[in-house]
Each structure stands twice: as C-alpha cells, then as structure tokens.
Amino acid sequence: MQNQSVQQANISIMSSFSGSKKVYAEGSSPDIRVPMREISLSATTGAFGEEENAPVRVYDTSGPYTDPDVQIDIHEGLGALRTKWITGRGDVEEYNGRIVKPEDNGYKKEDHAAEYPGLQRKPLRAKPGKNVTQLHYARKGIITPEMEFIAIREHVSPEFVREEVASGRAIIPSNVNHPESEPMIIGRNFHVKINANIGNSAVTSSIEEEVEKMTWAIRWGADTMMDLSTGKDIHTTREWIIRNCPVPVGTVPIYQALEKVNGIAEDLTWDIYRDTLIEQAEQGVDYFTIHAGVLLRYVPLTAKRTTGIVSRGGAIMAQWCLAHHQESFLYTHFEEICEIMKTYDIAFSLGDGLRPGSIADANDEAQFAELETLGELTEIAWKHDVQVMIEGPGHVPMHKIKENMDKQLEICKEAPFYTLGPLTTDIAPGYDHITSAIGAAMIGWYGTAMLCYVTPKEHLGLPNRDDVREGVITYKIAAHAADLAKGHPGAQIRDDALSKARFEFRWRDQFHLSLDPERAMEYHDETLPAEGAKTAHFCSMCGPKFCSMRISQDIRDYAKENGLTEDEAVNEGLKEKAKEFAEKGSRLYQ
C-alpha cells in the first residue's frame, strides 16, 4: 500500500502484521463482511512427524488499511460501508446542512483555515417523526445489519446483541453520517473495548500528526477514537479523522464551543453549544462526552479536595455555573440535546466532570453525587431511545475500585461503564500507563465495558506516535485479562495457542500471536539475532542447559520411548540416578 500525504506531510499507512492476513466472515447478505485478522501457525514437529496447527482468527480494528486488495487515498476517505444499510431503512433524509464558518476552525473572518479536500456529501438526518437510533430499532425487535455484523465479530447470536442493546446494557455508536465505520458494540457482556485519545492542542501537533496517530492506534487495536483537539483547525482535523476512521469517533463538544468564545467559559451560551453539537453531528461524530451532571450545588463539594476538579469539561462547566450562579445549560437543556442525538444516532458518553484526580479524592461525596445525576439523565435519554454510556474515574486505589462498579450498575441501571483507568497510585509519572492498567484490568473484570487508555505521557505532555502504541498495547493487555477473567467465549484461544507455541519453541508463531509482534521479535533478537535462533529450543534467559520447557519436553520424550507416563518417567529417572550414585561408590564428593 502506498504512503499518502496530508498537505505534503507523510502519513504512515499500515500493512498487516507479519504472519497475518486480512480475512472476512460473511453474514446473511454479501454486504455484511466482517473483518478478522487470521494468524497462520507452523506445524508442530514431534516424535511421530508433523502435526498441523490451525490458524487463529482475532478481532481486527485496523479497517481496510490492512487489506492488500484495497487502495486507500486519505484525501478521499474510506468507502461508505454502511450507507446502503442506513438509507435502506427509509427513515433518513439528505439536507444541505450548516455552512462551515471560520470560527469553527478557531479563525477570525480574514484568516484562512485548512480544508478537507475529499468527498463532500450532504449530511443525513432522521425524517420528521422518525428515530434512527440502534436502541430504537432494538426495542422494536428489529435486528439491523449492524447488529448482525457485531454478532459475527463477538461470536454471539444477533438476537443476543439486539437484547443487550434494547435493555440499555450495550450501545452501538453509529452516527448516520459516519458510514465509513465498521459496527462495534460497547457492553459488559461483550469483549472489553479500549479507546485511544488523540487531538491537537494550542501548543503542539498538527492535522497530519493526528491522522497518523489515528491510523497507528487502530493498527494496534483501538476500538474507538476520541478527538480531543483544542487548537486551530478543530473542524478540519475532525473531518480528516472521521472520513478516514473505520472505528467510532467521540468528542467533547464543549472544547470546541469554548474555542468559539476565545476560551472564556462564562461567555458560553446554549445557542453556541447547540450549534457546535449540530456541526459535529453532521460531520459524523458517533458519541459525545457531555458533562451534564456537574450541577451548581455540587461544585462546593470539591473545595476540600486535594486536586479539585481535574476534568477539563467539568472545570469549564463549574466555572460557568459559578459565574452565572445558574444551573448548567447542559442540564437544563438536556431534553433538547436528546432530540439532536436521536436525529443522527449519536450516543451519550455522560461525562464524569467531578471524577477524582488523586487517590486522596477517590469515592468522595462530589464524585458519587454527580453519579446520581448521571443515573437520572440516563433514564431521560432512554425515554428518547438515545444510547448512553457512563464515564468513570479516574484515580482510585485498588480496594475502592469495586465500589465504583457496584454503584454505577445500581444507579445507572446497568448502562455501560467507560473508565479512564483508574490509576491505582499517584507516584509514577512516566509510568501511568502501568498504574492505570492495573485498575483497568480490575474494573474490566468487575464489569466495565470500555477502558480509556492512558499513555506514559499522562500528566506530562501530549502523546506522540510511540506513546499511542504503548498506551494501546498496555490497555489491550488489561482488556484481554478482563475478558479471560469474565470467561468471554473464545477469549483463551489465543493464549492457549501462544502457550503451545512457546512450549514447542515455535518462536515465529510466538511473535505472530503476541499483541505486539514487532516488540516481541525485537527483544528476542537483541541477544539471539541469528536466523537459527528462531528454531532453537532455548532463549537467552536460561540458555540451552537450564530451559525448564526443554527439560519438560525431554521427560515427555523419555516417557514415550519407554512406554511410561510422565510421572513414571520422572521416577524411573530418579531410580537411574540413584543406581548410578551407588555404582560410583556412594561418595558425596567424587
């Protein structure tokens, strides 16, 4: 696949991992083709010849970028996978949409903003009186193509997917204006998902870097992306990302609304915010983080905290509430927001604006007061058949994590939980991907549906491409560990295949089956780079004489040769050594 460019800057377009290929599982119609990554395995060589090992198929988030038969020009965007499904239901209409304004990109009228050169199609919206959400269809008993697609991906039945969505326990983020996305589901009875945050800031980064980070993150396994841009060209950056993104995209609309009022929180208005919601809805944002639970009466509860309000969105709304001494317009206009959401099928990610920013503040009154309000808002959204997930902390020590999950399930009626970690200690700047992955694995096991990744740069700076990779892989580990603990169907297949390859010294298969094949091979080759080392029955950790797996295999071979069980072989070996010791005179030192 050829590398493309954004405004003459290089963007890395991926190829598949070594030892893997893109395959598709077909559904009930030819246009339901579910992508998977198939990992080829070599044969096992044993005493009785070779035994074939079946390939392993794994969940694939990389989109068409890793399909050698698809040519991608990121200036044009990805193919519109879902358009036929969306229009075929007969409940959407095209319309002209709003005009893009200079202030959408953070410029004054005389300035010139960057533009996306690709396909300019008219936005879609629900026809008058119609509701186009996946929750609405599920409650009507309709299994949509999106639901069937997901069922194949998750190895469950389409009816199970429909039931989970209808109950509110799962969501399918799927804006009708993001037809490029491959359907996925967020719910605790499915694979634990991970989100990767990208986005420019007023200080650093560019459109090119953010598009590259997006393609990079999905290559390593990000299930959704959040564009948290706060600098110039916000609208255009988002357009580049959405048109080229095969996974759902989320945003925090208050960030862009704040840019439109020059960063002065008290100048925000409902009209500016509403216009921003529609702007982003027309572009195709799949879920909005909205901090509607930050109420005026909750702000004083944060006064005695160690770290106060650490959520950007929460701090913006708290400042607005105090400046006007009024309740947040996100709260007072919530039903109107629901009307917008269901017009495009955008899911709520109800923001935890009062999440704890230190373990000293974990599980405090402010945090749980906001959670109560999020529970109330969830039921209002469900009244409109709008999909909802709930955002969670934050910084929480291990012994307080389960309380968060239990309260969220009870208060928010089992709506999916989406947590940032949580970070389990505050003493490891530079390693917060690890401090948070510990909490993420635990809360994923307890029932969290999606984990927001944390990179090594957390609290320190804007992550670069390498940081994104590190964060995604770390969180894939946490999510997979949670899947194993929950007993998700098929979760252990990959572990078992890798363990078998490890015991049989099939080094390349070990690399190919790992979450980061390139890193695994790199570390192996640092000490044993020769090609022959890829078939050696040892590694540099123990060497040839002390490899426990090689010794175990020797015992098995001895047992087979002598018609013994492995226990009998060990006992026979002990007897032989005892006899040898006696024959040499039974002397302790020879």
Swiss-Prot record:
Keywords: 4Fe-4S, Iron, Iron-sulfur, Lyase, Metal-binding, S-adenosyl-L-methionine, Thiamine biosynthesis, Zinc
UniProt cofactor note: Binds 1 [4Fe-4S] cluster per subunit. The cluster is coordinated with 3 cysteines and an exchangeable S-adenosyl-L-methionine.
Entry EC no(s): 4.1.99.17
Pfam family, one: ThiC_Rad_SAM
Pathway(s) this gene product operates in, as recorded in its UniProt entry: Cofactor biosynthesis; thiamine diphosphate biosynthesis
Any Gene Ontology CC annotation: cytosol
EC category name: lyase
Any one GO biological process: thiamine diphosphate biosynthetic process
Entry binding sites for substrate: N197, M226, Y255, H291, S311, R312, G313, D352, G353, L354, R355, E391, Y418
Family: Belongs to the ThiC family.
Function description: Catalyzes the synthesis of the hydroxymethylpyrimidine phosphate (HMP-P) moiety of thiamine from aminoimidazole ribotide (AIR) in a radical S-adenosyl-L-methionine (SAM)-dependent reaction.
Protein name from the UniProt record: Phosphomethylpyrimidine synthase
Upper lineage: Bacteria, Bacillati, Bacillota, Bacilli, Bacillales
Gene name of this polypeptide: thiC
